[in-house]
Amino acid sequence: MTTKRKPYVRPMTSTWWKKLPFYRFYMVREGTAVPTVWFSIVLIYGLFALKHGAESWAGYIGFLQNPVVVILNLITLAAALLHTKTWFELAPKAANVIIKGEKMGPEPVIKGLWVVTAVVTVVILFVALFW
């Protein structure tokens, strides 16, 4: 059975997401994937340079010292920190931690995740620089 009634389709512009701050931030957060791709490509380039010997590795180090690459890597770091912050804020919503019959608030979980991140970062830097 077919109908002749025309369904109402509400018009929607391509910039609908720009009207609400929540959606704008969501798009920025999802956009952090682009700098992550950049970092992945640079890392793979470094692995290939390491594989091909000292001369290739020296070229890779020279590439990393280029001011444009340094700026892109700083943008990538900022994007990674933003993405990490949003995931750490999401974690307490996904896990209900109950201590002595009461649900724990999100602050201790978020702070704990940042502490673990800082400790792991310091350990990795210590091993990389002084071991």
Swiss-Prot record:
Subcellular location(s) per record: Cell inner membrane
Listed HAMAP family: Fumarate_red_C
Membrane topology: Multi-pass membrane protein
Domain of life, per lineage: Bacteria
GO (cellular component) term, any one: plasma membrane
Region forming the signal peptide: none
Any coiled-coil regions, as ranges: none
Transmembrane segments annotated in the record for this chain: 30-50, 61-81, 110-130
Keyword Cell inner membrane annotated: yes
Keywords, comma-separated and alphabetical: Cell inner membrane, Cell membrane, Membrane, Transmembrane, Transmembrane helix
Protein's name in the database: Fumarate reductase subunit C
Function, as annotated: Two distinct, membrane-bound, FAD-containing enzymes are responsible for the catalysis of fumarate and succinate interconversion; fumarate reductase is used in anaerobic growth, and succinate dehydrogenase is used in aerobic growth. Anchors the catalytic components of the fumarate reductase complex to the cell inner membrane, binds quinones.
Organism: Klebsiella pneumoniae (strain 342)
Upper lineage: Bacteria, Pseudomonadati, Pseudomonadota, Gammaproteobacteria, Enterobacterales
Family: Belongs to the FrdC family.
Gene Ontology molecular function terms on file: succinate dehydrogenase activity
Subunit structure: Part of an enzyme complex containing four subunits: a flavoprotein (FrdA), an iron-sulfur protein (FrdB), and two hydrophobic anchor proteins (FrdC and FrdD).
NCBIfam families: PRK04987.1
Keyword Signal: no
